[in-house]
Amino acid sequence: MSKKINYFSRNFADVRQELISFVKQYYPAIFNDFNDASVGMMLLELNAAVGDMLSFHTDRMFQETQIDFAQEKSSVLSMARTFGLKIPGKRASVTIADFSVVVPVLGDTFDVSYAPIVTRGAQISGAGKVFETSEDIDFSSPFTVGGVPNRLVIPNLDNNNNIINYTLTKRELVINGVTKIQSRIVTDSDVKPFLEVILPDDNVLSINSVVALEGTDFTTNPSNADFFNEDDRWYEVEALADDIVFIPDNTKLSDNATIKPGKFKRVNQRFIKEFTDNGFCKLIFGGGTEDISSLCDFDVNKSLVNRIGDFINNNSLGLTLSPNKTLFISYRVGGGADTNIGPNTLTSINNIIVNVNGPNATTNQQVINSVTVTNPLPALGGKNEPSVEEIRNLVRYNFSSQE
């Protein structure tokens, strides 16, 4: 005799009652003691508890696939990736900082030969937060690198109203965060499509530059020039299928503040940046290759080998890394809502390189020692990583925002 099973019971009480009815109907001679203290009732209730738990987890798993009801951040992030939406991490605050130095007099103005240059990446701090400059600060120029006037010249007078020196103040943009460099030796096992490299920090703000240099025995980090060498550099793109990047040219000025001089370049060495569910930054490199060494083993015409290589080597998603190289990743960490600090807070100089090329070494050192800094404006724009509700709304309205 076929047995009818009711599949609509989902909670403990319903499953328990269904099991009792099932036993009464099909096994009345084997078991008929439904007292709460009986062994048979214990077995029935154990099965009812298992059924209740299975129903609960089935509902929870289905709930995590629905954008309106998902509770786990990993589930919402997974749906965001499915829809091609990149969820950002923490945001860094920005502010304006006044860098001041004292330079000697020359005639009726200051001696420009003692005007220093502060290299990019100068670090200042206050309230436990560190900020960095993104460009060189040239005190001999009245303009920023972008051509915006930003220098103030203040004469310093003695008791007889004679000018004894000048204070030069340059107003520059500083961004919260600290630059770090991570290195990794590329081995043969790393030469594979879509290699993933996860950075060790969970508060990565941005990737400054990525280069792969020949050799595996580096004892020092590359210089700024090495990091921006176009032959060794790997470029960040929105998607691996994007093969054209814009490279700014800081040596040229624009008469329009909304236009940045530069050039577009087609590149094969590219990567994308994503964030894991735990907030760590992950770099994913390309999946193609330009290696035709396997074809060269055959005794065929060299030009024919190259033509065959053009067909079988697909670089549409970028190149894979090459072995026996060292990968250097320059990136910035920091950010968060607590980096929004008040004015006149950034008064400490942490790490700064000041170049003064005046004729007198003692005066050069005096100029270097005179560097001071403060922020006349509060730091704004810092934000924590998006919450689950923020990500949910970003995913929900992602398609409508593209119309």
Sequence positions of predicted segments:
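Signature of Asx- and small-polar-rich beta-strand/turn repeats characteristic
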Residues: 1-403
